[in-house]
Amino acid sequence: FEKVQHKLPMLSLANAFNQNDLEEFIDRIKKYLNLDHREIIKFICEPKIDGLSINLNYENGILISASTRGDGKIGENVTSNVGNIIGIPKRLQGQSYPKQIEIRGEIFLNKKDFIKLNKKIDKKNKFSNPRNAAAGSLRQLNSNITKQRPLKFIAHGIGKCSKEYSTISNFFNDLHK
């Protein structure tokens, strides 16, 4: 696959396993933003979908490229393999989308589809988990194989965008118009 440099880095998520981890994370955010330790920060929380991170680049509402996260700075161009994935529109709906926007999210397989897929594959080629199945399916050189896999997409944020949003909530609200 052709290498693609991201316009803005695609950072990976860190885990918080307990209350202390979460409090340390909040302290780091406040320090980074030069906020008083008493300042209250609002968060949007969402379930962690364990899939393959993807960056979808739209211009004038039309999908022009899709790339994997890779090392966060450079990913792989997988545009030819995302066309039939549930949840990835080739054209954005409505009128409120920005002229240029990168939508970021996860390509994944749900557990039920993962089990079905592994039943169809011979024993030596079975996938060890749904995340590996999603990654292996997306990175097929033969896009017909990718089309046959029940991959799904869920958006969780934006990269480079021609319109500024003060919060991610404002972005999601704007997209629903």
Where are these regions (language model features)?
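RNA/tRNA-interacting regions in translation and RNA-turnover enzymes
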Residues: 1-177
